[in-house]
């Protein structure tokens, strides 16, 4: 990579808090933000709109190449995502979209198709990259790497609370099973399995508030910046 802009990677399983933490840290640093999960979800949405068969890897790879995805960075408040020019932000956060994105992400050719698109986010003054393989595959040379984790029960509880606050009725045990199944898929896939980079700082977010986690991450950057 010719662009030496600093990169902070924040990886971890679904529900560990990496999205919220990454957005806040990026906003406070004034850096760009990459939500790699949103990129895979965007491809999932496009595939759903086109009624593609998830068992047809060739069609999904074409979809990954052809889908136009635009991120509207909105600071700490969140991220607006346009898929082929259409605002798909709300659809990206559906549980069904997450499951589809996880299945699509397991296809090596899709991951390869999206690799350079993700690396293109590395621009001055810096980038906070949130995902599952940011520190191991996409930005292995990143100066700052963090891996957030939490128990499956903790993560299911957070998701249950989020959905209930939005008026969505869900069963906790169903969410827990979905999270455990996704953990297994992410950890067992052949290409870029979910695991911490060897030089990543591990932070267990169980029982810790978001602001405390943000402070730890920002403190890491401060301690390693000359």
Curated annotation (Swiss-Prot):
Pfam family name, one: Cytidylate_kin
Keywords of the record: ATP-binding, Cytoplasm, Kinase, Nucleotide-binding, Transferase
GO biological process, one term: nucleobase-containing small molecule interconversion
GO CC annotations, alphabetized: cytosol
Localization terms from the record: Cytoplasm
EC primary class: transferase
EC number: 2.7.4.25
Entry superkingdom: Bacteria
Protein name as annotated: Cytidylate kinase
């Amino acid at each position: 990579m010719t662009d030496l802009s600093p990169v902070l990677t924040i990886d971890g399983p679904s529900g560990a808090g990496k999205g919220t933490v990454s957005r806040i840290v990026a906003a406070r640093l004034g850096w760009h933000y990459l939500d790699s999960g949103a990129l895979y979800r965007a491809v999932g949405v496009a595939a759903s709109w086109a009624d593609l068969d998830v068992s047809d890897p060739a069609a999904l790879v074409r979809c990954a190449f052809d889908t136009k995805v635009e991120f509207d960075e909105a600071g700490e408040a969140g991220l607006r995502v346009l898929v082929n020019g259409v605002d798909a932000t709300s659809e990206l956060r559906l549980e069904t979209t997450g499951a589809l994105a996880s299945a699509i992400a397991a296809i090596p050719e899709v991951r390869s198709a999206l690799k350079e698109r993700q690396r293109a986010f590395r621009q001055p003054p810096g980038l906070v990259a949130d995902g599952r393989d940011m520190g191991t595959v996409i930005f292995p040379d990143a100066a700052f790497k963090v891996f957030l984790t939490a128990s499956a029960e903790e993560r299911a509880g957070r998701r249950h609370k989020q959905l209930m606050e939005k008026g969505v009725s869900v069963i906790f045990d169903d969410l827990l099973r979905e999270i455990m199944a996704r953990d297994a898929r992410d950890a067992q896939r052949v290409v870029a399995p979910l695991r911490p980079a060897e030089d990543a700082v591990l932070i267990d977010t169980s029982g810790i508030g978001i602001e405390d986690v943000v402070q730890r991450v920002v403190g890491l950057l401060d301690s390693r910046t000359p």
